[in-house]
Swiss-Prot record:
It comes from Helicobacter pylori (strain ATCC 700392 / 26695) (Campylobacter pylori). It catalyses: ATP + protein L-histidine = ADP + protein N-phospho-L-histidine. The gene is cheAY. The modification Phosphohistidine is found at H47, H273. SUPFAM superfamilies: ATPase domain of HSP90 chaperone/DNA topoisomerase II/histidine kinase, CheW-like, CheY-like, Histidine-containing phosphotransfer domain, HPT domain, Homodimeric domain of signal transducing histidine kinase. Residues 270-517 form the Histidine kinase domain. This is Sensor histidine kinase CheAY. Residues 134-185, 209-255 are annotated as: Disordered. Residues 136-166, 209-226, 233-254 have a biased composition (Basic and acidic residues).
């Protein structure tokens, strides 16, 4: 039973592989019905699937493919001319065959497929085609010359002989198609279970050996047959032909033993697991590089550093090579997706009553398997729209003096670490004026928005939910769904989509997608204690500017960069993170570009470029807007990965004048009197707080009080102004002083804030723990009022004698 299951799995793999090219071959055959090589290739697919399904007792699939084979066989002999109507029946049968294969894969049987009536109807149509054309073929045969008749009869005899071998094997013709036909009939009823199982295993092994021999024989016969034709056409070079043939024969004799060793099928789940392990290895490499940098800084000049550097460099290089090798195993040609579109365009052409030609280029371009699986649906929507909305009806194209056959071109090529897929048509193009009017009519935009909108921005209106230019809803399109989903799906792949169009000339849509989604290069930036990774493919440049270079236009901050004016927005405003704006210091701006859009994003600091492994945020957080995932940095800290497309959309709704914020920050920093200085006292003892209050009153400063560390932390985070110093007890309920100090130091904006421990703990261990948690001063209870005021004045930089 295990052997039979293995044969079934091999059959399904082979069948699905053959079907990938089948639709495209059939559409090509419809345009070139005289192409005998193409017809033979299609016939062999039906013949192979029929033979294998018959052996596996898949009777429904065998019945369907047998009738398909009959039609294709008649076409090979010239008895049937492939017309669009006949091709409709064949294509429908192919669809049903694919459905049966999926059912077999899922259930192990071709029964209960839910398509019984459709299959029976398709079989009747195939049989009708075969019988009708067989009669006409007989009539043509009687009128043909005697010589031709004899040759045709010989050919028919050969074909019938092959068919008879497949349909009803006998003892006389079992050598190739059915190696089991000469087996004696055994009385299985009187055999033990072990004997029956052994006999089945023997027969399976015999069948497998026969299949191997048959495949090897076909390989040896394939090339000599192809070389017969040129021999007749070029009789002047028989020696060259003979040498080539001899060489081919020699190579073919070696081929079977070599070919088997060259490839091996691997479960996709193993590749995914291997890719995950590589991701962890990359994280470990980044961590190792970071540790080496720390060691190098601490032990500068030591001899062991050179050897350590060699080891780290070697591990880094091997990890990179291994990563590229594993990624290459996951790469697949986009032709796996492209191959299904000729059939789709052919069906749409007949449905819409248009003549449309699909031109495919660059189908050998490779892309990560996970992306290949995801781009199919977006491309279907785009191509359907090109056929329905783009290509004009036949009469309209004639009036415009355009070729009657419209062209849709699908091409793919590499551009850096991205793949570019272009879909172009020579249809009517997009009218930006009409698009704006439709958008205003549907309430998508206002008239004021339309006035300042460029043509390219108008083209992007088709990506708005519910927007459609179709006047009539059809089975193909017009419901206003599809293109917004296309944009969403492409952005999920960290890709972009651009549209360029000209009225009367056509439309071009360009998709730009990264080659892989697992590991990317990113720019690491920081906003206070938060870290973010921006995909490097979207980063145009980074600049450091002063406050004087920031202007205000219509209430929003902008930056004049060379000859461009860019909108400015703080990353902290997008993700609602606290930030400090130093009015007297420069700011870092990351210029981000997506398609034709650019913005400047202000960050607190730049960390650098790093290779990051994208990890999912999990089920509950995966739909967090603006975040594509997370990664672990070389120093072990978690970093969020920015979804650039979503972030730019979020930035449009933010209206913050950065200059005003900086001025406000400057105003809060100016200290005109002692009361402008703020000190926060945190102690659970009301008596101790009263003592602090009495000691500091002569200074004239503002004193805030909290009863425990947790309350003090909330006051610090949510207060309008940042205290100039904090006096904190160690022993407190809810949150002690050590924990409070550790939490405060997590925020960059509090990194220089004086934290003064006021405690009765005086041991060296206590003091060391205080320093490690972030304390800057240590006052031991009991203390004098003079000492307390001296420490506070020094910490807050209060000048003069205020007592």
């Amino acid at each position: 039973m295990d052997d039979l299951q293995e044969i079934m799995e091999d059959f399904l793999i082979e069948a699905f592989e053959m079907n990938e090219q089948l639709d495209q071959d059939l559409v090509e055959l419809e345009h070139n019905p005289e192409d005998l090589d193409l017809l033979n290739r299609i016939f062999r697919v039906a013949h192979t699937i029929k033979g294998s399904s018959s052996f596996l007792n898949l009777n429904i699939l065998t019945h369907l493919t047998h009738n398909m084979e009959d039609v294709l066989n008649r076409a090979r002999k010239g008895e049937i001319k492939i017309t669009p109507d006949i091709m409709d029946v064949v294509l429908r049968s192919i669809d049903l065959m694919k459905t049966l294969l999926v059912t077999i894969r899922d259930t192990g049987s071709d029964t209960n497929n839910g398509k019984e009536n459709e299959i029976e109807e398709a079989v009747k149509q195939l049989q009708a085609i075969t019988s009708q054309n067989l009669e006409s073929a007989k009539e043509r045969t009687t009128e043909a010359p005697q010589k031709e008749n004899k040759e045709e009869t010989k050919e028919e005899a050969k074909e019938e002989n092959k068919e008879n071998k497949a349909k009803a094997p006998t003892a006389e013709n079992t050598s190739s198609d059915n190696p089991l036909a000469d087996e004696p009939d055994l009385d299985y009823a009187n055999m033990s279970a072990e004997e029956v199982e052994a006999e089945i295993e023997r027969l399976l092994n015999k069948r497998q050996e026969a299949d191997k021999e048959r495949r090897a024989q076909k390989k040896q016969e394939a090339k000599p047959k192809q070389e017969v034709t040129p021999t007749k056409e070029t009789p002047k070079a028989p020696k060259t032909e003979t040498k080539a043939k001899a060489k081919a024969d020699t190579e073919e004799n070696k081929a079977p033993s070599i070919g088997v060793e060259q490839t091996v099928r691997v479960d996709v789940r193993r590749l995914d697991h291997l890719m995950n392990l590589i991701g962890e290895l990359v994280l470990g490499k980044n961590r190792l590089i970071r540790i080496y940098s720390d060691v190098e800084e601490r032990y500068d000049g030591e001899k062991f550093l050179e050897e350590l550097n060699q080891v780290v460099s070697s591990i880094s290089a091997v990890t990179t090579d291994l990563q590229l090798a594993v990624m290459k195993t996951r790469m697949q040609p986009v032709g796996k997706v492209f191959n299904k579109f000729p059939r789709m365009v052919r069906d749409l052409s007949r449905e819409l009553g248009k003549s449309i030609e699909l031109i495919i280029e660059g189908e050998e371009t490779e892309l990560d398997k996970s992306i290949v699986e995801e781009i199919g649906d977006p491309l279907i929507h785009i191509i359907r729209n090109s056929c329905d909305h783009g290509i004009e009806p036949l009469e309209e194209r004639r009036k415009l003096n355009k070729p009657e056959t419209g062209k849709v071109q699908l091409s793919a090529y590499n551009e850096g670490n991205h793949i570019v897929i272009k879909i172009s048509d020579d249809g009517k193009g997009l009218d930006p004026v009409m698009l704006k009017e439709k958008a205003i009519e549907k309430g998508v935009i206002s008239e004021r928005d339309a006035e300042g909108m460029s043509d390219r921005e108008a083209f992007n209106l088709i990506f708005k939910p519910g927007f459609s230019t179709a006047k009539v809803v059809s089975n193909v399109s017009g419901r206003g769904v599809g293109m917004d989903v296309v944009k969403t799906n492409i952005e999920k792949l960290n890709g972009i989509i651009e549209i360029d169009s000209e009225v009367g000339v056509g439309t071009t849509q360009k998709l730009k997608i990264p080659l892989t989604l697992a590991i990317i290069q990113a720019l690491l930036v920081g906003v206070q204690e938060e870290y973010y990774a921006i995909p490097l493919s979207s980063v145009l440049e980074t600049v450091r500017i002063s406050q004087d270079e920031i202007y205000t236009v219509d209430g929003k901050s902008v930056l004049r960069l060379r000859d461009e004016v860019l909108s400015l927005v703080r990353l902290s405003d997008i993700f609602k993170v606290d930030a400090i704006l130093e009015s007297n210091s420069d700011v870092y701006v990351v210029i981000i570009g997506l398609a034709d859009q650019k913005i400047g994003v202000i960050v607190d600091y730049l960390i650098g470029q790093e290779e990051v492994v994208i990890k999912s945020l999990g089920y509950y957080l995966k739909n967090t807007r603006g975040i594509a995932g997370a990664t672990v940095r070389g120093d072990g800290k978690i970093t969020l990965i920015v979804d650039v497309g979503a972030m730019m959309d979020m930035a449009k709704s933010i209206k913050v004048n950065i200059t005003t914020l900086m001025n406000e920050s400057e105003n809060t920093k100016s200290k005109n009197s002692p009361s402008d200085y703020i000190v926060l006292a945190i102690d659970d003892s009301s008596t101790d707080r009263a003592i602090i209050r009495k000691c500091l009153k002569p200074l004239g400063i503002t004193l805030l009080e909290a009863t425990n560390g947790l309350e003090g932390l909330e006051m610090l985070k949510n207060g309008d102004k940042i205290p100039d110093a904090i006096l904190v007890d160690i022993e407190m309920p809810k949150m002690d002083g050590y924990t409070f100090a550790s939490e405060v130091r997590k925020y960059n904006k509090f990194k220089n804030l004086p934290l003064i421990a006021v405690t009765s703990r005086v041991t060296k261990t206590d003091r060391m723990r205080g320093v490690e948690s972030g304390m800057t001063e240590y006052i031991t209870k009991p203390y004098s009022g003079e000492y307390l005021t001296t420490v506070v004045k020094r910490s807050i930089k209060l000048e003069g004698d205020q007592s």
